[in-house]
């Protein structure tokens, strides 16, 4: 199939367009004013909105004016602030979108150009799209403006690398739009720089004014504080100097006064000594006359008063001793009543023992003997050779060690027996004895030197035994002993019950050790309290 002349021309034109010579011969084509106008308006609007958004971030007043009076400005500001925290993602999305749009535009332009080439007979001259990058000085510009210029330069480089062949009219329109965008961005950059410099100058002047104000205020305050401190130090120095001089003057006056008083005292002393000597002679003569007269029996009265004071001391000691004995008797009766009270399961008599100790110590002070054999203390004797210059008599007798009294011995035994321990009542001792019935049954079945098997066997067979009660016999088997002890405890015959239990040997005695200890403590306390009562009654 033969190709037509038009198709040959199209093929030839494509071959020439693939060669990067910059121009190609084509038939004349109609200009696209609407498309060029659209590109110019779009790029201008983009530059206007981009500049308004960037300057709104620097100046709040301009931002309010821009968002309130320019259409779609508020939405664009919100979108910018939304993507401001993630600029990398925003740039990637913008670049992908611009690349896709440019590819679509290029494909559309290519398709439409091919269609128009096939349908048109008139061929016009085409040029390869080659745009100049935006050479704008961004050294001191806003970072966001730098990003926008960089993105636009990347887009221009991408369009240049694609080697698009477009008609000359469109090429001129795009180039003009590129120049307009470059001019607008340059103006925007200069505007931003000027606004930033004005803002920095204004802010610097404000900061300098504020610092000057602070400096003047701090200077005035420092001068005021310095003046105040200096005045205060001067006042303190003046006050201290005044006090020091007053103190020195007062000391000098006091020293002169003391010197004058000492001189006057010496003169008066010399005069008074002679007068006192004469006065003493007169008084001595009068005293001798009175002593030989009305005061002749003064020594006899003094001896009788001493005898009366001794009698009062002896009476006081006797009364105190009787009161101590009464209190001791009361405490002993209190201990007896508590020990014999069956309503109390156990008794602690530590408080009563402390009172007994106090009363016994008080009573022992009344029973002390004199240091001399004749019953009189050396200090009571007159005319003794050991009498000193001051009338005191030093005793030369050897100290006597009195043997401990029965009262103190009984108290010590009571304290060692009952200190920190509880005394059981007769009923409690009887109940504890009844609790030993099962152990007694087991012990009655144990063979001599029984082992674990013997213990278990005796424990099992003891369950089939009965406890022996009633009138006890004189037999020595365990049941009879248990019955006799229970009968003695029932009639409160604790002494015989303890003797029966103590006579046991072997395992039964081992079982009853705790019970024997409690019962013996009860018996010992009863006997010691009885001895204490008898001793108190003999005093």
Curated annotation (Swiss-Prot):
List the GO cellular component terms.
MICOS complex
Q: Per its UniProt record, what PANTHER family does this chain match?
A: MICOS COMPLEX SUBUNIT MIC60, MITOFILIN
Q: Does the keyword Transmembrane apply?
A: yes
Q: Which family does it belong to?
A: Belongs to the MICOS complex subunit Mic60 family.
The residues on the Mitochondrial intermembrane side of the membrane are: 57-539
Q: Which Pfam families match?
A: Mitofilin (PF09731)
Task: Give first and last residue of the transit peptide.
Answer: 1-16
Put simply, this protein is called MICOS complex subunit MIC60
Subunit description: Component of the mitochondrial contact site and cristae organizing system (MICOS) complex.
Per UniProt, the keywords (alphabetical) are: Coiled coil, Membrane, Mitochondrion, Mitochondrion inner membrane, Transit peptide, Transmembrane, Transmembrane helix
Transmembrane intervals: 37-56
- Where does it live in the cell? Mitochondrion inner membrane
Query: Which top-level group of life is the source organism from?
Result: Eukaryota
Q: Name one GO biological process term.
A: cristae formation
User: Which sequence ranges are listed under topological domain Mitochondrial matrix?
Assistant: 17-36
Q: Which residues form a coiled coil?
A: 172-267
**Membrane topology (UniProt):** Single-pass membrane protein
């Amino acid at each position: 199939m033969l190709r037509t002349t038009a198709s040959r021309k199209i093929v030839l034109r494509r071959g020439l367009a693939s060669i990067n010579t910059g121009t190609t011969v084509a038939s004349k084509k109609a200009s696209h004013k609407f498309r060029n106008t659209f590109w110019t308006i779009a790029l201008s609007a983009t530059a206007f909105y981009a500049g308004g958004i960037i300057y709104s971030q620097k100046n709040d007043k301009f931002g309010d004016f821009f968002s309130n009076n320019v259409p779609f400005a508020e939405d664009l500001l919100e979108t910018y602030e939304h993507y401001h925290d993630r600029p990398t993602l925003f740039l990637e999305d913008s670049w992908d979108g611009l690349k896709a749009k440019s590819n679509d535009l290029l494909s559309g332009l290519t398709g439409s150009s091919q269609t128009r080439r096939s349908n048109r007979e008139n061929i016009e001259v085409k040029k390869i799209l080659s745009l100049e990058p935006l050479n704008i000085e961004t050294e001191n510009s806003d970072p966001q403006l730098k990003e926008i210029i960089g993105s636009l330069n990347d887009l221009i480089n991408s369009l240049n690398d694609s080697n698009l062949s477009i008609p000359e009219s469109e090429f001129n329109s795009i180039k003009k739009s590129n120049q307009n965008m470059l001019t607008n961005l340059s103006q925007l950059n200069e505007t931003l720089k000027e606004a930033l410099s004005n803002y920095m100058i204004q802010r610097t002047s404000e900061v300098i004014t504020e610092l000057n104000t602070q400096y003047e205020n701090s200077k005035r305050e420092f001068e005021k504080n310095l003046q105040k401190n200096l005045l205060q130090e001067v006042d303190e120095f003046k006050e201290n100097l005044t006090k020091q001089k007053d103190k020195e003057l007062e000391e000098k006056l006091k020293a002169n006064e003391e010197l004058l008083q000492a001189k006057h005292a010496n003169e008066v002393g010399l005069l008074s000594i002679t007068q006192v000597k004469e006065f003493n002679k007169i008084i001595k003569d009068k005293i001798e006359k009175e002593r030989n007269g009305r005061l002749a029996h003064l020594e006899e009265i003094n001896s009788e008063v001493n005898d009366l004071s001794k009698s009062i001391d002896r009476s006081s000691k006797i009364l105190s001793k009787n009161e101590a004995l009464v209190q001791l008797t009361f405490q002993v009766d209190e201990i007896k009543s508590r020990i014999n009270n069956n309503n109390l399961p156990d008794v602690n008599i530590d408080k009563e023992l402390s009172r007994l100790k106090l009363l016994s110590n008080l009573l022992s002070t009344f029973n002390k003997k004199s240091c001399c054999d004749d019953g009189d203390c050396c200090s009571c004797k007159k005319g003794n050779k050991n009498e000193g210059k001051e009338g005191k008599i030093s005793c030369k007798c050897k100290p006597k060690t009195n043997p401990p009294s029965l009262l103190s011995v009984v108290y010590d035994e009571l304290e060692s027996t009952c200190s920190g321990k509880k005394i059981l009542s007769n009923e409690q001792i009887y109940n504890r004895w009844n609790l030993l019935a099962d152990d007694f049954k087991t012990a009655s079945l144990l063979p001599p030197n029984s082992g674990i098997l013997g213990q278990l066997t005796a424990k099992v067979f003891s369950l089939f035994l009965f406890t022996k009660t009633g009138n006890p016999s004189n037999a020595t088997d365990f049941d009879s002993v248990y019955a006799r002890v229970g009968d003695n405890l029932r009639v409160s015959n604790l002494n015989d019950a303890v003797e029966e239990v103590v006579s046991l040997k072997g395992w039964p005695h081992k079982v009853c050790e705790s019970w024997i200890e409690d019962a013996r403590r009860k018996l010992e306390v009863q006997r010691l309290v009885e001895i204490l009562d008898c001793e108190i009654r003999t005093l």
